[in-house]
């Protein structure tokens, strides 16, 4: 992994009791060695693979001002991290989920992009076997389950200050509270809505097919082309590029997809991250509720699966063998 560490600061928040969250500040930056590099690579990999929300700094953000000063005037990164940890403690202490942890400020470069990653990492206990085959307790940072993490794309922030996506953060296992906490700490607002962008793309695809008066098979072929491209981008960690996507879709009318979507006012960005759950709707129907969970290929609607809108009834012709086997065994058991 081509990841170059510039500087890392570690501090700690310690929960003394239900009302007290103390700060333990390190007096020097963390030296970069093999163990530190491995930790940052793992943190970068785990964070990059998770679903993130996008944001931007509010005008007058204290953290943004401090970071800007730190970078423009070449101020002490350690001092910046120490002051920011104090603000982090003040915000985190407002929430009942505050448990403390190791606070990491990592400035690094990856593929010519400069980042600042801020994370609160929990420590966990585990067991290990030593050379004498004795069991010892060891402590480790639980990076895989980290959910209090934010990352600033410093390159994007400084070269394109009008961007709505240079700041990202995780939603977290406790939902909106973690999002609120990071918004308060960073003094930021939510920016690019990736789900809305993906939903807009799906609507544009459906309207594009309808405008060209395509039949069912032709529509599904276009949806499959869109899904294949978007899924490839998702797997590669790349964003959906509308211009590239338009080239992947075989022309079906007088206008190509890019021209059509631009003229119809879907307000799609030139590029945006793919959302796996939303894109799945291109090829599948899925839903759950009331004790029922179901998903099926979109091509089956109208062939083996029929929906009566008036009665809200789905009729399935030909059940999957494993489901049919369970139903038969339950029926036979009931008849004995």
Curated annotation (Swiss-Prot):
Q: What is this protein called?
A: Nucleoid-associated protein Spro_3255
The family annotation for this protein states: Belongs to the YejK family.
| Location(s) in or outside the cell | Cytoplasm, Nucleoid
Listed A to Z, the keywords are: Cytoplasm
UniProt KW Cytoplasm keyword = yes
PANTHER family in UniProt: NUCLEOID-ASSOCIATED PROTEIN YEJK (PTHR38772:SF1), PTHR38772
State the organism named in the record: Serratia proteamaculans (strain 568)
GO MF annotations in UniProt: double-stranded DNA binding; single-stranded RNA binding
Q: InterPro entries per the record?
A: Nucleoid_associated_NdpA (IPR007358)
What Pfam families does the database record attribute to this sequence?
A: NA37 (PF04245)
């Amino acid at each position: 992994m081509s990841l170059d560490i510039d500087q890392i600061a570690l501090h700690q928040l310690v929960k003394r009791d239900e009302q007290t969250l103390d700060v333990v500040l390190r007096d020097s930056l963390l030296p970069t060695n093999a163990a530190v590099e491995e930790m940052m690579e793992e943190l970068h990999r785990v964070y990059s693979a998770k679903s993130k929300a996008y944001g931007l700094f509010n005008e007058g953000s204290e953290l943004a001002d401090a970071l800007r000063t730190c970078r423009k005037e070449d101020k002490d990164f350690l001092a910046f991290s120490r002051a920011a940890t104090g603000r982090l403690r003040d915000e985190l202490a407002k929430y009942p989920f505050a448990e403390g942890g190791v606070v990491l400020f990592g400035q690094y470069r990856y593929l010519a992009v400069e980042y600042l990653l801020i994370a609160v990492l929990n420590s966990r206990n585990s067991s290990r076997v030593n050379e004498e085959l004795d069991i010892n307790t060891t402590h480790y940072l639980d990076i895989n389950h980290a959910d209090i993490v934010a990352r600033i794309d410093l390159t994007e922030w400084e070269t394109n200050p009008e961007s709505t996506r240079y700041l990202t953060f995780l939603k977290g296992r406790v939902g909106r509270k973690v999002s609120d906490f990071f918004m308060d700490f960073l003094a930021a607002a939510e920016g690019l809505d990736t789900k809305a962008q993906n939903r807009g793309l799906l609507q544009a695809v459906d309207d594009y097919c309808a405008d060209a008066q395509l039949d069912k098979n032709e529509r599904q072929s276009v949806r499959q082309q869109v899904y294949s491209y978007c899924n490839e981008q998702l797997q590669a960690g790349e964003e959906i590029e509308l211009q590239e996507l338009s080239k992947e879709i075989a022309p079906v009318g007088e206008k190509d997809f890019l021209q059509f979507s631009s003229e119809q006012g879907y307000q799609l960005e030139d590029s945006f991250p793919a959302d796996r759950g939303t894109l799945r709707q291109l090829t599948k129907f899925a839903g759950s509720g009331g004790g029922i969970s179901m998903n099926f290929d979109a091509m089956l609607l109208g062939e083996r699966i029929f929906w009566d809108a008036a009665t809200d009834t789905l009729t399935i012709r030909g059940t999957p063998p494993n489901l049919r086997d369970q139903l038969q065994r339950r029926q036979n058991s009931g008849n004995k």
